[in-house]
Structure formats: C-alpha cells, structure tokens
UniProtKB/Swiss-Prot annotation:
UniProt xrefs under InterPro entries: Ald_DH/histidinol_DH, Ald_DH_C, Ald_DH_N, Aldehyde_DH_dom, ALDH-related_metabolic_enz
Domain of life assignment: Bacteria
Entry protein name: Aspartate-semialdehyde dehydrogenase 2
Organism from which the protein derives: Pseudomonas canavaninivorans
Catalytic site: D243, C277
Amino acid sequence: MNNLSLSLAADYKAMVVSNPFDGSPVGEVMDMPASSATPLIDTALLGALVARELPRHERARILEATASGVEADRDAFARLIVAESGKTLKQARKEVSRCINTLKLSAEEARRNAGEMIPFDAYAGSESRQGWYTREPLGVIVAITPYNDPLNLVAHKLGPAIAGGNAVVLKPSELTPLSAIKLVGCLIDAGLPPGVVSVATGGAALGKALVAHRAVRMVSFTGGFVTGEQISRIAGLKKLAMDLGGNAPVIVMADSDLAAAIDACVSGAFWAAGQNCIGTQRILIEAPAFDAFKKGFVEKTRALVVGDPADERTDVGPMISEAAAKRAEALVNEAVDHGATLLFGNLRVGSLYSPTVLENVGCDCPLWYEEVFSPVVMLQSVGSLEEALTLANELQYSLHAGIFTRDLNVALSAAKRLEAGGVMINDSSDFRFDAMPFGGFKYGSMGREGVRFAYEEMTQPKVVCLNHTGTGASVISPGKTTTSF
C-alpha cells in the first residue's frame, strides 16, 4: 500500500479478489476511482525527489534486503500467487525464485550502470575537453502489470526503476493485486522511503487517468495489444515501454531430438495454463518427423494432471476466469467447424480448460493468427525450413520463437531469419532468463525489459563536459570566444 491509500481507505469501496479455481474470496483491496490519480501522482512527485538523492549503495541495499524478505516468506508468496492467479504450486514457487533473482539483479544494476567516459579528444578541436555521461532518473513512472505473473513482472518494473532513482505508481491487475501489495510491503520493510512506490488498485478508469497525467514521464505496461494501443493514444509526450503479446512458433526439424523437443514444447504450451505471452502456440514440424512428434506430444499432453492448483500433483490449473476459458473453447470450436482436427482436449469445467491439441488449423482462423493465451497448441506439418519460416513470420506478434535441430548451420540461419525478439535453439519459445533483453519485433513490444535493459529504459543520459585550458588562458575559435575559469 502507501500512506495515501491508507488515509483514504475508508472513502473507497472494496474490490474482492477471488480464487479462479473455486471462486472463493482471497482478499479485498480498494477500488480507487480515476479521481485518485492526481493525489497518487502528487505523492510520487515528492517521492521522486527523495529517490533521486538515494545513494546507489542504499538503493542496492534496499533491493537486496527486499530479496531477502521475499526469500524468508517464499512459501506465503507462492500460496498467495496460487490463490489469486490459479497458477499451480510448482509454478508459483518458480515465480517466487525468479522474483528474488530479479531483485538481486536490480541491486547489481544500481551499483554498476552509471554511464562512462566520453573521449572528446577523438575529434580535432576538442583536445581541451574531457567528460562523461551519467544515467539520471526519469522521475515518476507508471507501471501497469498483468495477472499471469503477478509477482515477478512487478519486480521487473519496480526493481530497475528503484535502481535508477525513480518513483513508481504501480497499478497491478485488479485480478491479482495481492502479490504486488505484499512485495511492496517487503520494500517498505527494507527501508524504501515513503512515496517512492505507491500502489494504485482499481480498474481501467484509474489506469487511463494515471497514463494521461502530464507529470508522468514514462509508462511501463505489460498486457494486451488492444490496451497497449489505447495507452499509446492517451499517454501524450511520454516514454512508453510495452510488452503486448505473442503467438510463438516453434520449428521442429526432422533431425532433431524428438523426445527433448516434445518435452520442451509440452511445457512451453501448457505452463501457467497457456496464459503466457511467450508460450508455444504453433509447432511447425518437418514432414518426416510429424507423425512421431504428434504421437509423442499427444501422449505427454494426455498425462498432464488438471485440477486444483494448490495440489502438489497438479500440472495445469484453471484459467484466470470462466470467461477466459469460454473464449478458448469458442476459438477451438470455430477452428474445428472450419476443418481443423481436434487431437486432444477441448473440455471445460468452469474456469478449468483442458490442454488442447489440434492440427490442420487454417491460417485464416483466429485461433491461428491471434494470441490465444490459453492451453491450446496447434501442430502443422511443413515440407521445408523455408515453409516453416514463412509461416512463423507471417503474424504481427513476434516476441519469441524456437527451433529444434542438430544442424548448427540450420539453427543459425533460422535464428537470423526468424522475426522475433528472441530465438531459442533446441528449446521452446517459453524460455526467459531475467537478465536478458526481453521484447519483440513488429507489434510484440516497444522497448525492452530484462533488468539491465529496463534500467536503461527507465533512466536518461546526461553529458558533463569540462573545458580545461589552463589558468588565465583563453581559447578563440571562429565566431566565438571562450574564456577559461
């Protein structure tokens, strides 16, 4: 929370956070109206004055102490993620571990990334000058995070922003705000000064008001393409960083290790019930390997346990809502009606939607060209690498792609030609290391995340140039006289 939220809590109605699996209440937060945007930003403006003056070692200490706080309470964090998002316990535990790593990486960035010297004497006429540039804070950043990674994606915005000396107004998804609030509590316990991070809980009207506020210098958004377009229209002259979605292809060549490819693609397709912007959605298999891959993939999918995400044995939990599961079901039914073959799945009970595998989905079907964001994957036989690359590159989303092959030349050629922000060789599209640059080509994103790269997005360079010409001397250049100190 924040001091503003606590002082106004009595004036706002409650917003209930529900468990996607059984609908039970998990907690309540304030449903803050659009009118709260200005006081939130005013608080952040004061916090920004404090944040920019925090020594780098203190920023790093706070982030490291926060990582330790999350570590000490990791089981409670994991169970909260399960309760509010529907992720399975094993998936939630992995997310907590990644959050700890993200915070530690951010602490390292606070100490390391401070600019560099500039060789002014590299060009004639500047021999008397020396200087450097530093990375300076932007000021107030609005960070908007989604429901599918309710803890680590928050850390990916707060960590680099704090490392860079900024203040942040964080608007977590109204579906999963509790993990974010708990993380901010750890930051406060670690000594983060008041106003440096505020939490804004509410719906779209609040988000629009925050994005449109003139005092905000940057909006960092992870979410859907439609919302991203709306933000770009109303933000005005602000820096924007966005991760907007994906429809990730994976190419499987006939010479690949099929067992490894099947294991990786099953995980890549169905992790977090497919609610994953780099999740594997289309698998393009070279024809000689297609039947064997299909058989093994369906067998592995059939073995997945679907059910209560709090059960240690569960592999696939619910989607975020029954409406989301119904959307997936409708897209699959439409594809089948237009000639696709259902190989497994398409069973729904409430918000639970079974892992679903299809083949021969038409390229004109929404299931093929939209981001499905559900546990649905399509298999497609291809005659060559060229055909696979054409199909892989034809869509507007382009975060990650993957290719399986034993041929290094094929792998490197595909990596060069795939239009994606990241190409995973002998891995599914669903691999992300929190230190690497993360983003896409085309409409997949604007800017990059990954701690170092987000730090650079959230700071700005300032050049300092010193002209030292000797005591009492002066330098005369055509049309200009410069006198030394």
